[in-house]
Amino acid sequence: MAAPDLAHGGHVSRDSVCLHEEQTQAAGMVAGWLINCYQDAVTFDDVAVDFTQEEWTLLDPSQRDLYRDVMLENYENLASVEWRLKTKGPALRQDRSWFRASNETQTARSHNGGQLCDRTQCGEAFSEHSGLSTHVRTQNTGDSCVSNHYERDFFIPCQKTLFKIGEQFSVLGQCGKAFSSTPNVVSQQACTRDRSLDYSSCGEVFLNQSYLQARAGSHNGEETWKWKPCGKALTHSMGCATPVEMHAVRNPHVCRECGKAFRYTAYLTGRVQVHPGEKPCELEECGKASPVSSSLTQHVRIHAAEKPCECKECGKAFTGLSGLSKHVQTDPGQKPYECKDCGKACGGFYLLNEHGKTHTREKPFACVVCGKYFRNSSCLNNHVRIHTGIKPYTCSYCGKAFTVRCGLTRHVRTHTGEKPYTCKDCGKAFCTSSGLTEHVRTHTGEKPYECKDCGKSFTVSSSLTEHARIHTGEKPYECKQCGKAFTGRSGLTKHMRTHTGEKPYECKDCGKAYNRVYLLNEHVKTHTEEKPFICTVCRKSFRNSSCLNKHIQIHTGIKPYECKDCGKTFTVSSSLTEHIRTHTGEKPYECKVCGKAFTTSSHLIVHIRTHTGEKPYICKECGKAFASSSHLIEHRRTHTGEKPYICNECGKAFRASSHLHKHGRIHTGQKPYKCKECGKAYNRFYLLKEHLKTYTEEQVFVCKDCGKSFKNSSCLNHHTQIHTDEKPF
């Protein structure tokens, strides 16, 4: 099928898209890479994609044909670039007939009367590799052209094996002699001489005497020719032309807009179209435009729902061969690369290398802005966008932008509800693979990330990173509103909701909203009255594990949190924090209605209900409502008669701990409430308030019978008995 004509601003339909675009893009990338790396010796093994025998069987005939075409074109690009790097200027300007530039080529053609490459299947011969490549593509050979030789390596699928990925040799059609590099295929000297030229210093084998001499010079430190502009030293005169050609004509096509140089005019054309915003390649279905046609290939298949590459194991289909290759490597049953340190199996060699860096902690890529190090260049590129503020990936649903594509992918699933990753143990689904991985560890108990300071282990690396900041004291996430700092980004996000008033977690039963998910979970249990956590000592049940842990400390008597000011101990850290505020006088929670401040957020919440009149806690026995759950609990004991708080001095029992605390002052003689005017002290706060009225002469309690006024209600009640002749005592 012919490639779609996109070079002149034409529209593209689904029927006009073919796999040739993918082939062209891959070949162009290889050619560009080879040119940039011209200084080093490049072999076909550096750019070839290798398949194992098992992976090859998963490909259907059309996928094998595509693979064959791409590899042949890569091979052609490799041969062309390598030869041009080693010939002089005039040869570079010749078209694709670079074989004719060498006398050795003419001698090589003497094998078959001027025909270098032989097509054994049909008998047709060609003088150039490009001619053979084109001919191979025009033949509808199907599976018959696939070599069945699967020894140590995989042969490129072609009726006449041209090269082998592992040892990488070319076959000269007439004599069948194998060579280690493409230019040497055309060397008559190589055809008549065995591979016996080796250099004893390093043991390398060469096909050409000049290559051997050049290698020997590199060992001896010879630098006979030196190129002045770049200072590159060369050991033989033939190579001296190479830097000249590379500096002068390696990238002859220069963009006038930005000055960037390109090897080929096609690359320059694509670059020029980017600057003025020209996008001649436009799609009929959605109007998506791109400066180059190859950019639309993958996108077109989205509209066409075309996924020609299908995995034979699980049936999953992909738009391109590269997607299938990655899938085959990441398939759970196909993880041939095992880590020698921990035994973990990876689906690809690249993944194994990345995993290996977690053991060595190797981070060779540094940010020039902040100096932070990363394991690979892609992570560094993503990080740099934090400094530049670039967010190229935008959500089509809500317009939110992201710095990385995976961030957008995860976000889109919040709109679609897609959760493609399912736990095989419990069936729970997740929108990200990392979420599933973390969840699976709850079943296995695996905690691979261990703190070197205290030995505590974690299921995810981010938790370890946050924990490590406890030891270092680092708090990099700071609130711009109040300056409060946090060890993790999630802590800052939750804190910001106290400023914005955002409450994203809403109860489906009553509509009440919360700013923390755990608060919503706690609230939901008030509807279900679920208390799944039971104390093994007294069988008391609780809504969550934290409440149970606090309760257990009543039985054990453990109070690990001690106040440095007064020595008082507490069972939980939050109680110590609240207690410290009694010494400092800090009251950070202020009522916006009346301005009254409180030491704890729970006290503020209860206070606000005095303004709103809200009483969400209702007694099922009598229907009485309360503003706080603790008041409801105390009230229920009036029905049950329960008095769990007993005085150790006199044995008196009370329904609430606060009542016991106040009663205890009778035995200790403690009087914490002191008058500032006269210094008189009281053990109850209401008694101090009554005393203060003697200074203000406030008399608000008036007798209805005689009009006499009193300072407090108890005095009025005592006076009322005079009018009723009541004598209760």
UniProtKB/Swiss-Prot annotation:
Chief localisation class: nucleus
Any GO BP: regulation of transcription by RNA polymerase II
InterPro entries found in the cross-reference section: KRAB (IPR001909), KRAB_dom_sf (IPR036051), Krueppel_C2H2_ZnFinger (IPR050826), Znf_C2H2_sf (IPR036236), Znf_C2H2_type (IPR013087)
GO CC entries: nucleus
Keywords: DNA-binding, Metal-binding, Nucleus, Repeat, Transcription, Transcription regulation, Zinc, Zinc-finger
GO MF, any single term: zinc ion binding
Gene3D superfamilies xref list: 6.10.140.140, Classic Zinc Finger
Residue ranges of domain KRAB in the record: 42-110
Chain intervals annotated as zinc finger (C2H2-type): 115-140, 253-275, 279-303, 309-331, 337-359, 365-387, 393-415, 421-443, 449-471, 477-499, 505-527, 533-555, 561-583, 589-611, 617-639, 645-667, 673-695, 701-723
Entries under SUPFAM superfamilies matching the protein: beta-beta-alpha zinc fingers, KRAB domain (Kruppel-associated box)
One Pfam family per UniProt: KRAB
Subcellular location per the Swiss-Prot or TrEMBL entry: Nucleus
Protein's job: May be involved in transcriptional regulation.
Family: Belongs to the krueppel C2H2-type zinc-finger protein family.
Protein name: Zinc finger protein 778
Originating organism: Homo sapiens (Human)
